């Protein structure tokens, strides 16, 4: 593709060629040093207005999710329908909502659900996914039904923590707030803190 675009002699194509060359260089650099990918992700989240605390939580959640999907691959599960089904079971167990219901609750359409979770939701989702991975490594499930059971057990650990936190604080953990609303609230909070 790059060679094809390079062969276009138009001066109007020059800025696009330069952009493509820069992007290709960045991706090749990231392949050599994966930390650059993390830094780029942090800068992109920062540009969208996310707080440093939320960004750190989100990057950790990406790492934990990858560990879980690596475990599922090790067990012979296939990406796509099986991963989606198990993810739905984990969400349904700890949050009482499937992925689709959770996204609807937050007013999302195509946006990434995890990018629209609050810190508490991210932490509990990480607990559910980490617990599922640990139980899977310990029990070595073989059939898909055994994986379903493991996903429920992992989600139950986070569900118990969610219920306990809600009892202690008197506040619901599952929030209808999406990223735009959370960012707006954080900005208003920062303004009021500066005024004091």
Locations of regions flagged by a protein language model:
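Positively charged, phosphate-engaging catalytic surfaces used for nucleic-acid and nucleotide handling
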Residues: 1, 6-196
């Amino acid at each position: 593709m790059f060679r094809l675009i390079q062969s276009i002699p138009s001066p109007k194509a020059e800025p696009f060629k330069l952009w493509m060359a820069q992007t290709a260089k960045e991706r090749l650099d990231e392949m050599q040093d994966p930390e650059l990918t993390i830094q780029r992700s942090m800068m992109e989240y920062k540009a969208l207005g996310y707080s440093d605390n939320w960004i750190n939580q989100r990057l950790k959640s990406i790492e934990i999710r990858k560990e879980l999907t690596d475990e599922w691959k090790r067990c012979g599960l296939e990406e796509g329908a099986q991963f989606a089904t198990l993810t739905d079971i984990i969400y349904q167990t700890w949050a009482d909502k499937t992925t689709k219901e959770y996204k609807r609750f937050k007013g999302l359409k195509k946006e990434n659900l995890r990018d629209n979770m609050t810190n508490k939701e991210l932490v509990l989702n990480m607990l559910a996914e980490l617990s599922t991975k640990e139980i899977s490594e310990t029990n070595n499930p073989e059939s898909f039904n055994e994986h379903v059971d493991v996903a429920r057990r992992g989600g139950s650990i986070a569900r118990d923590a969610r219920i306990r936190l809600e009892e202690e604080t008197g506040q619901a953990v599952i929030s209808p707030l999406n990223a735009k609303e959370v960012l707006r609230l954080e900005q208003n909070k920062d303004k009021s803190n500066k005024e004091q």
